[in-house]
Swiss-Prot record:
HAMAP family linked: UPF0291 (MF_01103)
Cell location: Cytoplasm
Organism in which the protein naturally occurs: Thermoanaerobacter pseudethanolicus (strain ATCC 33223 / 39E)
Transmembrane region(s): none
Signal peptide span: none
InterPro entries according to UniProt: DUF896
Family: Belongs to the UPF0291 family.
GO CC, any one term: cytoplasm
Cytoplasm keyword on record: yes
Identification of the protein by name: UPF0291 protein Teth39_0326
Amino acid sequence: MITREMIDRINFLYHKSQTEGLTEEEKEEQKRLRQEYVKEIKERVRRELESIKYANNSCEHCGHDHHHHHHHHRH
């Protein structure tokens, strides 16, 4: 779960690493936070893609059904 605090902490560690540098503990913490963050983002993307995939499938079935019901009248 990505929390506001987690984001703030990642930002804080990033800026500190750019300015004065991090201690070994902070480097470890930064690595853990980033892994957690990336894992969460990947999960979200996967869920998004799955819901989009299912939505598309049902739309296609819908579309195909409608085509069967249309009778083309030739003049």
